[in-house]
Amino acid sequence: MYKIILIAIFALLVVLAGGGYFFYKRRKRNRAIAEILSGGNLIGSWKYSAQEWQQAVAQEFSWAKESDGGGEIFISPSAIYIRSDSADHLIELNGSKVITHASYRGTEGAPLKIRVRWKVIERNMDSNAESTKYYKEDYRIPVPIGKREVAEKVAEWFSTRCQENLAAYTDVVGADEAISIFGDDSF
């Protein structure tokens, strides 16, 4: 009888911990979105027409639906937020993540290119050994016609940030990868 009660209490604690973690992550995400939408720390934003959105979905935003009729993007130093009528997507850029490349060619149809890198240090409790794993994620963000200056401003802002903080850049690049002396990762 006591075993059943202990198992039930343990199961309840696991469910509560999982629910608390989910609530925390959701609240953190909602705060990041609210900060971006307030516009206080915005680097750039633009809207996609229905036709531009269809192209963006076909090329890069596979998580969205073409039938949404348009979409919006908001870019801040800490996140990129993309939304449409049916879905949204938040790309967090804070914490241990470092943008190591940002560029825009400035021609029609050229995307804004952003590379994000981060590292994860895993510790083995038994042997006290550490292993470091390096990760990178590339984002190609379609730029609507007429938003060239905004995309150039975003690319310039992140490139300058990377060049001014080379220590963060070199910290997230593995020893077996080439490092640019200009603080700009090739894409």
Task: Identify the residue ranges that each predicted region occupies.
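Low-complexity, intrinsically disordered/propeptide-like segments
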Residues: I9, L13-G19, S96, Y169, ...
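N-terminal, helix-rich and Lys/Arg-enriched segments in bacterial and organellar proteins
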Residues: G44, S76-I82, R148-V150
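Amphipathic repeat-derived elements
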Residues: I4-I7, S76-P77, T160-L166
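Phosphoinositide-binding peripheral membrane targeting modules
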Residues: W63-V120
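Intrinsic-disorder/low-complexity loop/linker signature
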Residues: G40, Q51, S78, S86, ...
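Acidic, Ser/Thr- and proline-rich intrinsically disordered linker/docking segments
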Residues: K97-F187
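Anionic N-terminal interaction surfaces
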Residues: Y2-I75
